Regions:
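Hydrophobic-core positions in well-structured secondary-structure elements of globular domains
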Residues: 1-211
C-alpha cells in the first residue's frame, strides 16, 4: 500500500474561483501579485513555452516533488514524463519563479476505484508449483491537493483462482485551467510514484457548474 502526506513549506494563495475547460466556479490556489516571495521560491520552472504549454515543480517539506504539466501530446505517462525531463534539460529560460509570473492550480480531491484489466486472467506460477491467475484486480486511489499540500493513498486488491510506473523579461502565466498531467516523485528518484491526467474537473471538485 502506498500512503503519503506532504506539506508545502509556505501556504499558496487562495485565488478567485474561475473556469476550467467547460466548467466554472472552480476552486484555485497559486501565486498572484499579492503572494509572498517565500512562496515563489518553492516553485521551480522546468520549462515554459506558453500559458498552456509548460511544466513546473512544487517543492515540499518532505522529499516529495509535485510536477504539473500542460500541453503534452504523448500517449502515456512514461512518454509524458520523459518529454518533461528532455524539455527541462533543453530549456534556456529562467527556472526561477519570477516576481511577475503567475500560477493557477485547481484544488483536487478524488476517490477512484479502477479495475486493472491488463493483469487479469494471465497465468503465473507460485513457488509451490501451483498455477494461478488473477481473476479480478482492483486499485483504489485517494488523492487530495490544495494550497497547503496533499496526500495520497493507494492500495490494490485481487482475487485469485486456480487454473488448469535567470529571470525572464516577460511575465509568464502558468495556467492550469484545462487538461493537465500531475506527477508525484521522491527527490533523487528517476521515476514518479504517482501520475494522473485530469481533463474533467467535475470529477475532482464539487460544486462546479458547466458553462
Amino acid at each position: 500500500m502506498l500512503k503519503k502526506e506532504f506539506e508545502f513549506p509556505k501556504v499558496f494563495t487562495k485565488l478567485e474561483n474561475g473556469d476550467f475547460g467547460k466548467y466554472k466556479n472552480v476552486k484555485y490556489f497559486g501565486i498572484d501579485s499579492s503572494t509572498d516571495e517565500a512562496v515563489r521560491n518553492q516553485v521551480e520552472v522546468l520549462y515554459y513555452n506558453s500559458s498552456s504549454d509548460f511544466a513546473i515543480k512544487l517543492k515540499t517539506k518532505q522529499n516529495d516533488e509535485v510536477i504539473i504539466s500542460r500541453g503534452n501530446t504523448e500517449n502515456n505517462f512514461g512518454d509524458i514524463f520523459k518529454s518533461i525531463t528532455q524539455n527541462s534539460d533543453k530549456y534556456k529560460g529562467s527556472k526561477r519563479f519570477n516576481e511577475n509570473d503567475k500560477l493557477k492550480i485547481p484544488n483536487i480531491k478524488f476517490n477512484l476505484k479502477e479495475e486493472i484489466t491488463e493483469v487479469e486472467n494471465k497465468p503465473f506460477t507460485f513457488s509451490n508449483g501451483k498455477e494461478y491467475c488473477i481473476e479480478k484486480a482492483l486499485q483504489t486511489i485517494q488523492f487530495e491537493l490544495d494550497e497547503k499540500g496533499g496526500k495520497i493513498k493507494s492500495e490494490a486488491g485481487m482475487s485469485l483462482k486456480a487454473t488448469a510506473i535567470m529571470p525572464t523579461e516577460k511575465p509568464r502565466d502558468f495556467l492550469v485551467d484545462d487538461t493537465f498531467t500531475i506527477f508525484l516523485k521522491e527527490e533523487g528518484r528517476d521515476l514518479p510514484y504517482f501520475a494522473a491526467q485530469i481533463s474533467d474537473i467535475s470529477q475532482v471538485q464539487e460544486d462546479v457548474k458547466e458553462n
